[in-house]
Curated annotation (Swiss-Prot):
Native source species: Prochlorococcus marinus (strain NATL2A)
Protein name from the UniProt record: Photosystem I P700 chlorophyll a apoprotein A2
HAMAP family: PSI_PsaB
EC number from the UniProt entry: 1.97.1.12
Residue intervals passing through the bilayer: 46-69, 135-158, 175-199, 273-291, 336-359, 375-401, 423-445, 525-543, 583-604, 651-673, 715-735
Annotated residues for binding of divinyl chlorophyll a B1: H662
Lineage: Bacteria, Bacillati, Cyanobacteriota, Cyanophyceae, Synechococcales
Length: 742
């Protein structure tokens, strides 16, 4: 007899309804809930999935390399990066008529192609790649790596090669390995690639497999390193007249501290980037030798954490603050959800920083002038950051439900956070209301006075504190005599005393979008507070969901109901919308709105600067109708014209995505508004009709069709809302930017 899906749960496998399928899919990756799962098996399975995950990433990277090498125009783009549109891949579609075929035959191609807005061309060019052959070689190498990773994943599931539970819980060895080997060595290795391959290529010197052992990165070789004369590596940097990819203006330095941008490529100096990776690598390798493992030297994490308490005889607070950190080492080390929450939060912050820095400190040659790519990458990384951050709180809540031990954490900082949750949640609630009422109040006031023809009556507040922070970093335009904006300050004197040329002040005072601190005014002040409202409300919902995960006054035994439950059951009034999963679900809507506001702001401000029309954002951004009319509507018009009575144009695929994204988004509401009763009745009506229709009733089914649970229907609704949201906005960003700048 064939085993029914899911094999990991006999209870579900015997369910006679379609619940078996949907619950099976929903819990396929919840290894903890599977039949017969031990803690050791759980760790081993997760460890093997890491190799599979890396293999999928590798296939994706190899696919990009292969398709661009095969169908792209990398070699043509390299010859003129500023005026050649990069091709992502060809499009073959039998439905295309001649009009669309002609419209999408672009960028010098002879058949329909997609334009690349990924920044991959800029990245590969910057790191020294110049030919399709090199891209093919990269794809082949990564595919070999993928095969090795898949084998490693399989191998570590075999009894002989499964790591033990003690190995997984050896925190010090794990830290040393991740810090020194994964982060440290990989940073040093990347430094090696930059100085051996990328920097020479940027100076017109080709380094390949045939000569990389004979072309020295620096004329003096390793002599300065071993003699301690490290400064030699910073002498003779590229001049400000340097032309990227040629010997014109090229120097010999490999590690510099120039600051600012290479004037011609308008990206960070490659020698600065190499210096950064070298320093990061050294720091991580030192950090990777800090923790006590084989030789009994170094720090014990448990000792460090437990020293963070107020039992020290010289501590003035001794005996007042409790035992603070006792029990935290075991709590974190024994909870995968706690560890995952920390990792997701860290990666979420890093990803949001990447979004900001790709615009403010562009590291790839000529990418700053590819406005559509810059817009797409900012949006892409902020959306990813949002998902990671929401996931961090979700797994924090699961930790409180599944892994938290009240006895182990008695009276420590974790227990105290739980015991003061009412104060934390109510203060966050107060902050969100203050932000919301004041920000919306000012926006609406401004809308009203503008509508009545008296724009001079708007409430316009200059962001003086932010302007002061910019001035302290060197921005002169505001007239603050602070730190780097004051030539006689100690900061300026120290900066000017550094030997050699430095270009930070040139960059921060540029008049265009390549200044790393854009000029800000009242429109920025308002949208900043609107975004702060969104962030605080998202945080409020998520923090409340996590801190209330174990129980509340309304449902004191909530931890026994699990992370995701629809209502608290009969006999108690059936309180709904109260599980930690519901908090995640509700927070996602706020998170999506907030990310939309963040990306709206970044995109509109940059569009205005790129088009030389900064007044549009500065004047229209102070009231809501300005945002709706001069950003959303004005930039949607090109999308809506992708198809028109005169035929189609190259924006038509984005126009189609824009419309279809709205449809997906709206479909979400069907699941969010209609609950189980409606769907169950609809299903039973369809079943009744099917069973009474000749020919159709020859086809039957084993599982009795039942409606999705409330939690599942919400997930389906949220998924449609989310996918529709970013399909719509992704198409909007790409089409509205590329429609203006190509």
């Amino acid at each position: 007899m064939a085993t029914k899906f899911p094999s990991f749960s006999q209870g579900l496998a015997q369910d006679p309804t379609t619940r078996r399928i949907w619950y099976g899919i929903a819990t396929a990756h919840d290894f903890e809930s599977h039949d017969g799962m031990t803690e050791e098996q759980l760790y081993q399975k997760l460890f093997s999935t890491h190799f599979g995950h890396l293999a999928i990433i590798g296939l994706w990277v190899a696919g990009n390399l292969f398709h661009i090498a095969w169908q792209g125009n990398f070699e043509q783009w390299v010859l003129d990066p500023l005026h050649t549109r990069p091709i992502a891949h060809a499009i073959w579609d039998p439905h295309f008529g001649q009009g669309l075929t002609d419209a999408l035959t672009q960028a010098g191609a002879t058949s329909p192609v997609n334009i690349a807005y990924s920044g991959l061309y800029h990245w590969w060019y910057t790191i020294g790649m110049r030919t399709n052959e090199q891209l093919f070689q990269g794809a082949i190498f990564i595919n070999i790596l993928v095969c090795w990773l898949l084998f490693a994943g399989w191998l570590h599931l075999q009894p002989k090669y499964r790591p033990s539970l003690a190995w997984f819980k050896n925190a010090e060895s794990q830290l040393n390995h991740h810090l020194a080997v994964l982060f440290g060595f990989s940073s040093i290795a990347w430094t090696g690639h930059l100085i051996h391959v990328a920097i020479p290529e940027s100076r017109g010197i080709h380094v390949g497999w045939e000569n990389w052992l004979t072309v020295m990165p620096h004329p003096e070789g390793l002599t300065p390193f071993f003699s301690g004369n490290w400064g030699a590596y910073a002498q003779n940097p590229d001049s400000i007249d340097a032309v990227f990819g040629t010997s014109q203006g090229a120097g010999t330095a490999i590690f510099t501290f120039l600051g600012g941008l290479h004037p011609q490529s308008e990206s960070l100096w490659l020698t600065d980037i190499a210096h950064h990776h070298l320093a990061i690598g050294v720091v991580f390798i030192i950090a990777g030798h800090m923790y006590r493992t084989n030789f009994g030297i170094g720090h014990s994490l448990k000792e460090i954490i437990e020293a963070h308490n107020t039992s020290h005889p010289k501590d003035p607070h001794r005996g007042y603050f409790g035992i603070k950190h006792n029990g935290l080492f075991e709590t974190v080390n024994n909870s995968l959800h706690f560890q995952l929450g920390l990792a997701l939060a860290s990666l979420g912050v890093a990803c949001s920083l990447v979004a900001q820095h790709m615009g403010a400190l562009p590291s790839y040659a000529f990418i700053a002038r590819d406005y559509t790519t810059q817009s797409a990458l900012y949006t892409h990384h902020q959306y990813i950051a949002m998902f990671l951050m929401v996931g961090a709180f979700s797994h924090g809540a699961i930790f409180f439900v599944r892994d938290y031990d009240p006895e182990l954490n008695k009276d420590n900082v974790l227990a105290r956070i739980l015991s003061t949750k009412e104060a934390l949640i109510s203060h966050l609630s107060w902050v969100t209301m203050l932000l919301g009422f004041h920000t919306l109040g000012i926006y609406v006031h401004n809308d009203v006075v503008v509508a009545f023809g008296t724009p001079e009556k708007q409430i316009l507040i200059e962001p003086v504190f932010a302007q002061f922070a910019q001035a302290a970093s060197g921005k002169m335009m505001y007239g603050f005599n602070a730190l780097l904006a004051n030539a006689s300050s100690s900061a300026s004197i120290a900066a000017n005393s550094m030997p050699g040329n430095h270009y930070w002040m040139d960059m921060i005072n540029r008049p265009d979008a390549l200044t790393n601190f854009l000029p800000i005014g009242p429109a920025d002040f308002l949208v900043h507070h609107a975004i702060a409202l969104g962030l605080h409300t998202t945080a409020l919902i998520l923090i409340k969901g996590a801190l209330d995960a174990r129980g509340t006054k309304l449902i004191p035994d909530k931890k026994d109901l699990g992370f995701a439950f629809p209502c608290d059951g009969p006999g108690r009034g059936g309180t709904c919308d109260s599980s930690s999963w519901d908090a995640t679900y509700l927070a996602m809507f706020w998170a999506l709105n907030t990310i939309a506001w963040i990306t709206f702001y970044w995109h509109w401000k940059h569009l205005a600067i790129w088009m030389g029309n900064t007044a549009q954002f500065n004047e229209s951004g102070t009231y809501l109708m300005g945002w709706f009319r001069d950003y959303l509507w004005l930039n949607s018009s090109q999308l809506i014209n992708g198809y028109n009575p005169f035929g189609v144009n190259a924006l038509s695929p984005w126009a189609w995505m824009f419309l279809f994204g709205h449809l997906i988004w709206a479909t979400g509401f069907m699941f969010l508004i209609s609950w189980r009763g409606y769907w169950q009745e609809l299903i039973e009506t369809l079943v009744w009709a099917h069973q009474r229709t000749p020919i159709a009733n020859l086809v039957g089914w084993r599982d009795k069709p039942v409606a999705l649970s409330i939690v599942q229907a919400r997930l389906v609704g949220l998924t449609h809302f989310t996918v529709g949201n970013f399909v719509t906005f992704g198409a909007f960003v790409i089409a509205s930017t590329s429609g203006k700048f190509g």
